[in-house]
Amino acid sequence: DNIKPMKEFESPEKLYDELIASVRKYHPSTDISLIEKAYHVARDAHEGQARKSGEPYIIHPLCVAIILAELELDKETIVAGLLHDVVEDTVMTDEQIAQEFGDEVALLVDGVTKLGQLSYDADKVEVQAENLRKMFLAMAKDIRVILIKLADRLHLSLIHISEPTRRR
């Protein structure tokens, strides 16, 4: 019920404001400085990158973080949602994430990155079994890794569904 349809090219600033409003709604006293720092790091790291639709890449991590915030997850999970593609798609390292945001966030980002290396060849039973094995290992370490990955996939699915509408 909380998941909203894709909006046509929302500005990153408007999405960031929506993220903070969502966090403050369920945790009014939360210190948002770590979330703010993660947004700025992700925005700067993805500077100049765009999705196939032409919108700035930072829109995707922001939408993932909003989904996580609407699920009322903790600040570290939301921060990891903002940073989930930074190590994979930019020059930032796991060590830098740990140094800037702490080991907990770094472990979440690393877990999502490793899950991102899953193969999606639906025809191969062995590949599916390996994917499940990786997911169960990630869940055993921290279920939040799976929640971030699911939010990531959900947003990518929403983009995919809404693209034919945008092309018209």
Whereabouts are the PLM-identified features?
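Active-site helical microenvironments for divalent-metal-assisted chemistry
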Residues: D1-S162, R166-R168
